[in-house]
Amino acid sequence: MSTIIFGVVMFTLIILALVLVILFAKSKLVPTGDITISINGDPEKAIVTQPGGKLLTALAGAGVFVSSACGGGGSCGQCRVKIKSGGGDILPTELDHISKGEAREGERLACQVAVKADMDLELPEEIFGVKKWECTVISNDNKATFIKELKLAIPDGESVPFRAGGYIQIEAPAHHVKYADFDVPEKYRGDWDKFNLFRYESKVDEPIIRAYSMANYPEEFGIIMLNVRIATPPPNNPNVPPGQMSSYIWSLKAGDKCTISGPFGEFFAKDTDAEMVFIGGGAGMAPMRSHIFDQLKRLKSKRKMSYWYGARSKREMFYVEDFDGLAAENDNFVWHCALSDPQPEDNWTGYTGFIHNVLYENYLKDHEAPEDCEYYMCGPPMMNAAVINMLKNLGVEEENILLDDFGG
């Protein structure tokens, strides 16, 4: 009996000793106490926080909202900050978005940096103008088969001081959305029924954040307008979950509340006299509309400009009256739509084919100096790649090719 008791006592003492060792090691290895994050050398911008979390979270907790379209997952590469000291070594997860040269300059992804010690950061001053608003849905209407126009009302007395080409981030709570509950007008239901899309559901167990470019321009006051394409599973792989944020947005009804933050952006027009060529497709319409309206309505620009939009069929064209009106009012602006798959009932007599080919064959091929134009584009990835390849073959420098990756 005494042997058994001795064994139990020794085992207990060993466990207690190991616990003490772990606690001692933790006290030495894991930082405790307050952490100070200095920003831009300005004492008034300094943040005091607790160690252990991510830098992106610490900044957001202090009301400093750094853009992160993926919600902190490390996949979008937007939450770049410059860390002068205290950030530790760069992680492999960051190197997909940050070059070795940028890393030497202190570039990091805030969502991947753990807060372990006092830090010294450099942030763009415009970040401090980013705010968060709870908006109200005005409308959420189909503009094409798979694209809705979400129109949000900003709270009374507030404004979002964005520039044309900018974007906001939408926050979605945990939710369970059934596609069968979507409001899809009869004229668009054919493809939905054909591909049996109403069978899908989207269940999200934690809040998510995604970025969308504005379709309105700064002088359309009091609203935020977005073009949102539903991200359904690909036909050849129907078991892939549908897009979480697009499913949530498509479920919104007039009167619902929706939280956004912003403004963010870098897809801004250059302040030059160069000719502007806009190329869009799908939900890439949004920043194109914002830019063109801003140039012609707010700035009263006299720069030569054209807009080339690609759609599948006439049913997928939208804002036609808007652009027709702008073309009628402004001698320096023309716009063209090309259909890649016009239907018999369309009675289409305009351009057909993919928009990069149409743009080249009907304009740039005979342009006296295509390399001198500025090209602004937003659309599906394949369209973007085709347009960029075509422009580079024409000798257009990268500095004159401006791309918004959020569309399509």
From Swiss-Prot:
Known outcome of mutating residue 212 to L: Decreases flavin content, but does not affect the 2Fe-2S center. Exhibits very low NADH:quinone oxidoreductase activity
Its membrane topology: Single-pass membrane protein
Binding-site positions, [2Fe-2S] cluster: 70, 76, 79, 111
Protein keywords: 2Fe-2S, Cell inner membrane, Cell membrane, FAD, Flavoprotein, Ion transport, Iron, Iron-sulfur, Membrane, Metal-binding, NAD, Sodium, Sodium transport, Translocase, Transmembrane, Transmembrane helix, Transport, Ubiquinone
Effect of residue 79 to A: Loss of the 2Fe-2S center, but does not affect flavin content. Exhibits very low NADH:quinone oxidoreductase activity
Matching Pfam families: FAD_binding_6, Fer2, NAD_binding_1
All copies of domain 2Fe-2S ferredoxin-type, residue ranges: 33-127
Span of domain FAD-binding FR-type: 130-270
Entry annotated with the keyword Secreted: no
Transmembrane region(s): 4-24
Keyword Transmembrane included in the entry's annotation: yes
InterPro entries cross-referenced by the UniProt entry: 2Fe-2S_ferredoxin-like_sf, 2Fe-2S_ferredoxin-type, Beta-grasp_dom_sf, Cbr1-like_FAD-bd_dom, FAD-bd_FR_type, FNR_nucleotide-bd, NqrF, OxRdtase_FAD/NAD-bd
PROSITE patterns: 2FE2S_FER_2, FAD_FR
GO BP term, pick one: sodium ion transport
GO-annotated molecular function: 2 iron, 2 sulfur cluster binding; electron transfer activity; FAD binding; metal ion binding; oxidoreductase activity, acting on NAD(P)H, quinone or similar compound as acceptor
EC number: 7.2.1.1
SUPFAM superfamilies: 2Fe-2S ferredoxin-like (SSF54292), Ferredoxin reductase-like, C-terminal NADP-linked domain (SSF52343), Riboflavin synthase domain-like (SSF63380)
Cofactor(s) for this UniProt protein: [2Fe-2S] cluster; FAD
GO CC annotation, single: plasma membrane
HAMAP family: NqrF
Its biological purpose: NQR complex catalyzes the reduction of ubiquinone-1 to ubiquinol by two successive reactions, coupled with the transport of Na(+) ions from the cytoplasm to the periplasm. The first step is catalyzed by NqrF, which accepts electrons from NADH and reduces ubiquinone-1 to ubisemiquinone by a one-electron transfer pathway.
Entry's family note: Belongs to the NqrF family.
Subunit-level organization: Composed of six subunits; NqrA, NqrB, NqrC, NqrD, NqrE and NqrF.
Name this protein carries in UniProt: Na(+)-translocating NADH-quinone reductase subunit F
Gene designation per UniProt: nqrF
